Structure formats: C-alpha cells, structure tokens
Swiss-Prot record:
Classification via Pfam families: Nitroreductase
NCBIfam families, sorted: BluB
Observed effect of gene inactivation: Cells lacking this gene fail to synthesize cobalamin.
Function comment: Involved in the biosynthesis of cobalamin (vitamin B12). Catalyzes the oxidative fragmentation and contraction of the isoalloxazine heterocycle and the cleavage of the ribityl tail of FMNH(2) to form 5,6-dimethylbenzimidazole (DMB) and D-erythrose 4-phosphate (E4P). NAD(P)H is only required initially to reduce FMN and oxygen drives the oxidative fragmentation.
Reaction catalysed by this enzyme: FMNH2 + O2 = dialurate + 5,6-dimethylbenzimidazole + D-erythrose 4-phosphate + H(+)
Residue ranges that the Swiss-Prot or TrEMBL entry lists as coiled coil: none
Similarity field: Belongs to the BluB family.
Description of how the protein assembles with itself and partners: Homooctamer.
The name this protein goes by in its record: 5,6-dimethylbenzimidazole synthase
Annotated organism of origin: Rhodospirillum rubrum (strain ATCC 11170 / ATH 1.1.1 / DSM 467 / LMG 4362 / NCIMB 8255 / S1)
Organism lineage string: Bacteria, Pseudomonadati, Pseudomonadota, Alphaproteobacteria, Rhodospirillales
EC category: oxidoreductase
Length: 211
C-alpha cells in the first residue's frame, strides 16, 4: 500500500520547470519577505541530505546595516582584484557584469559549515571530511529551489574574502565560510542564465564518462 505522495507526470514536469527557471539572481526588488516564508525556506534547507545526518550547515541572517556595509566594502575590494586577474581583453566585459545584489536584496544569509559538530558522530567523514561542506552546499541548493518555487530569487556571492566575512559576523572559529546568499523578489525572470545572455559563458552539454 502506498504511504508516500504520488509524484505523477504533472509533478515531474513542474519539477523540471523549477530546475530550468532556477537562476542566480542579481537584480532584486526591495520588497520585504514575510517572516513565515523565511522560516519555511530555512525549514526546507534542513531537509537536505548530509553526511552521517550531521546537518553541519549554519545560517547567519545578516540584518545589521553596518555588517552589511563591511560585506559590500569587501566585495568591492575583492571584485577589483578579480577583474585585474582577467586577461586584458576580458576586463571590460567583467566590469559590466553585476555579480551581487548586496544593496537590494532584503534577505541576506551567510552560510557556514560547522567543522567541529559532533552530530553524526563522524560517520562518513574520516576519509572525506570535505563531505561536511558538500552537505552544506546541498542545503543551499535545497533552499534555493524552495525559494524559487515561491517566486523568490537567490544570488550566491562568492567574490568575498572568507576571513573578512567570518570576522564581520563574529562567528565561532570552527565555522568555515561557504556562501553568502542574497534573496529577494527578482526584477525579471528568465530560463537562460544571465552570464549566457551577456555572452560571458554559455552552458555546455554534460559529458558522461563510462568505464
């Protein structure tokens, strides 16, 4: 006797559409997100798989204006350095990219991995401790899909110095910085990645290696 939900063709089609329309969003409206929705997103993230059921993700909600200012300043510094690393012929194209929504996104989450957690009792981590951080990324992706299903957009800001973020948010030393997420109502929706539309990088078919 079936006890779980029925994932019928209609559901699968909707799920496929969710994957296609999940975008890395940089352009947000400033409309607030209600607290019930925020709580639901974090609850969905907690449903993600994790090595040894360790749930090592730690979400820090960044509301304080001064702390957000530190993040913006750090992005500005890191982005200038990253642009300088590009070949000269690509630097102007890089400068035209909008790589963050730090000034617009109403909800901002810094995501860390608790490298000292005893939850899970180390199961599956002895030979591959990096699976803890992989687990955090799974939680981020789960939250991302949950947000998109509710009409929200998510932008992952990676042009940041982890030590600066960790210090600015005053988190335990055992927490390793993984991601800074900007979340809000997108100004536009598109099934094609912005970097592809701007000519920076198109998607490529995924090769499958068989042995």
């Amino acid at each position: 006797m079936r006890t779980g939900p029925l994932f019928d063709p209609s559901f699968r089609d909707g799920l496929d559409a969710l994957f296609q329309w999940r975008r890395d969003v940089r352009h947000f409206r400033k409309d607030p997100i209600d607290e019930e929705t925020v709580a639901r997103l974090l609850a969905c993230a907690d449903l993600a798989p994790s090595v040894g059921n360790s749930q090592p993700w730690r979400f820090v909600r960044v509301d304080d204006g001064a702390r957000r200012g530190v993040i913006i300043d750090d992005f500005t510094r890191c982005n200038a350095a990253a642009r300088a690393l590009q070949p000269e012929e690509r630097q102007d194209a890089y400068a035209r990219l909008k790589l963050e929504g730090l000034r617009e996104a109403p909800l901002q989450l810094a995501v860390f991995c608790d490298e000292a957690t005893d939850q899970g009792h180390g199961l599956g981590q002895a030979t591959m401790p990096e699976t803890r951080r992989y687990s955090v990324v799974m939680a981020i992706h789960t939250l991302w899909l949950a947000a998109r299903a509710r009409g929200l957009g998510v932008g992952w800001v990676s042009v940041l110095d982890p030590q600066t973020v960790t210090a600015a948010l005053d988190v335990p030393a055992e927490w390793a910085f993984v991601a800074y997420l900007c979340i809000g109502w997108p100004r536009e929706e598109h099934p094609i990645p912005e970097l592809e539309r701007l000519g920076w990088q198109s998607r490529r078919p995924h090769p499958v290696v068989r042995r």
